[in-house]
């Protein structure tokens, strides 16, 4: 069945640009009018040079941002009194990501067929176990709009947290890559020319200069093998991290890195606290909540601690005791606040406070890390370039000094 592109306005005057499947143009226009849309433009899919080029492998799949926007908009529409099917139909039309639009279409079709919303979501990987369980809790309690609002806030905070971590990591990586590029250019393009000049002059070369010439010769002779080695090491790392033992070793190292380890630990505590608080406040029992939280930890060391806590709770021990046994990941303040929450029956509230505190800690850590890394990266770049320049010009200065004496 052909797919038609259209532009239309809804009853509120908002512009809607999307596609619709129909047998012909007349049917497509009628279907749009039945949806309450005022059609401004509708056209057949392009043919030949006008056809839209789509490469499935390069199309962006739905991500966390799409899910956060979907949750926020769905919560707003349900809170305004729209039915679930009406809200899903609207979101399906206005979603820009094509793959996510197809997912929403399948979800809407399943719900129309009598399937529970949570069950329809569970058929698609974009909706995590956490998401599906919270939606199920919302369906059971009759407060789906409130649950979706909490989910939207949770996903927005997670996006913000990831953005801060990414910003902290991006600058040093960019400077490092730039430094490597400059060093490669100097060593393979400039150093050989100086080496030829110095060889022709027949002067004795300092150790630093001989070292740079040796590195230059190696890079020019073995650039391709070195690139292949780097690619092989990358895939070897991916394979090793894919094994249970490798993931445990690398994840433990991530938590113990000199500078970034502290940031990773604070991020892990913030994510654990925020996720568990959301689940508990939505009515999920603590054993199931811990099991779901374990899957969102993103670090096998934290996953093992959460799994141990779940088993201890099943045996009758409180959560704070297990956390207190791992002060390197969960500081005493966390276990103490969890203990107070368990004693007062307000564990979800205490966990939210812990999450707020550690999200602020992450903010401060990222700010201080960025402030510290910037001058260090500039110094690093200066040392690399300065060492190469010094290695090349020292023999020239020596030759000039010898000639001036003569």
From Swiss-Prot:
Q: Which InterPro entries match?
A: GspF/PilC, T2SS_GspF/T4SS_PilC_CS, T2SS_GspF_dom, T2SS_GspF_sf
Origin: domain of life: Bacteria
One Pfam family of this protein, by short name?
T2SSF
Keyword presence, Isomerase:
no
Q: Spell out the subunit comment.
A: Homotetramer. Interacts with PilB.
Cellular location(s): Cell inner membrane
Q: Which organism is it from?
A: Thermus thermophilus (strain ATCC 27634 / DSM 579 / HB8)
Regions that span the bilayer: 69-91, 171-191, 211-231, 377-397
The protein here is known as Type IV pilus assembly protein PilC
Q: What membrane topology term does the record carry?
A: Multi-pass membrane protein
User: What is the annotated signal peptide range for this record?
Assistant: none
Share an example GO biological-process annotation for this protein. Answer: protein secretion
Instruction: Kindly state which keywords UniProt assigns to this record, in alphabetical order.
Output: Cell inner membrane, Cell membrane, Membrane, Transmembrane, Transmembrane helix, Transport
Q: Which Gene3D superfamilies match?
A: Type II secretion system (T2SS), domain F
Q: Tell me the PROSITE patterns matching this sequence.
A: T2SP_F (PS00874)
What is its biological role? Essential inner membrane component of the type IV pilus (T4P) that plays a role in surface and host cell adhesion, colonization, biofilm maturation, virulence, and twitching, a form of surface-associated motility facilitated by cycles of extension, adhesion, and retraction of T4P fibers. Controls both pilus assembly and disassembly and plays an important role in PilB localization to the complex and ATPase activity.
Gene Ontology CC terms: plasma membrane
């Amino acid at each position: 069945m052909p797919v038609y592109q259209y532009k239309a306005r809804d009853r509120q005057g908002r512009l809607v640009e999307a596609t619709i499947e129909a047998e012909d143009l007349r049917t497509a226009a009628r279907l749009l009018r039945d949806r309450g849309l005022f059609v401004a433009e509708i056209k057949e899919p392009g043919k030949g040079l006008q056809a839209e080029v789509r490469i499935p492998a390069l199309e962006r799949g739905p991500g966390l941002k799409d899910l956060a926007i979907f949750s926020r908009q769905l919560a707003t529409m349900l809170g305004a009194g729209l039915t679930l099917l009406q809200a899903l139909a609207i979101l399906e039309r206005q979603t820009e990501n094509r793959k996510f639009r197809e997912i929403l279409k399948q979800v809407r079709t399943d719900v129309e067929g009598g399937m529970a919303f949570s069950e329809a979501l569970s058929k698609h990987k974009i909706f995590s176990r956490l998401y599906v369980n919270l939606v199920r809790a919302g369906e059971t309690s009759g407060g789906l709009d409130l649950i979706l609002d909490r989910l939207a806030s949770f996903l927005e905070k997670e996006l913000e947290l990831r953005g801060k971590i990414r910003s902290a990591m991006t600058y040093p990586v960019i400077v490092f890559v730039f430094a490597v590029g400059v060093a490669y250019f100097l060593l393979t393009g400039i150093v050989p020319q100086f080496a030829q000049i110095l060889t022709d002059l027949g002067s004795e070369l300092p150790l630093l200069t001989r070292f740079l010439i040796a590195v230059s010769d190696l890079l020019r002779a073995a650039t391709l093998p070195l690139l292949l080695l780097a690619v092989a090491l990358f895939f070897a790392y991916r394979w090793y991290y894919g094994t249970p033992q490798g993931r445990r070793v690398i994840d433990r190292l991530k938590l113990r890195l000199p500078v970034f380890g502290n940031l990773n630990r604070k991020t892990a505590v913030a994510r654990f606290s925020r996720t568990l608080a959301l689940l508990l406040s939505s009515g999920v029992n603590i054993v199931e909540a811990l099991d779901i939280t374990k899957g969102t930890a993103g670090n096998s060391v934290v996953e093992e601690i959460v799994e141990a806590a779940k088993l201890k709770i099943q045996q009758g021990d409180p959560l704070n005791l297990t956390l207190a046994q791992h002060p390197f990941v969960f500081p005493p303040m966390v276990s103490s606040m969890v203990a107070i929450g368990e004693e007062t029956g307000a564990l979800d509230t205490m966990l939210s406070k812990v999450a707020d505190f550690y999200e602020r800690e992450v903010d401060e850590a990222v700010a201080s890390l960025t402030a510290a890394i910037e001058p260090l990266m500039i110094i690093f770049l200066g040392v690399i370039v300065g060492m190469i320049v010094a290695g090349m010009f020292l023999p020239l200065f020596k030759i000039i000094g010898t000639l001036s004496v003569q």
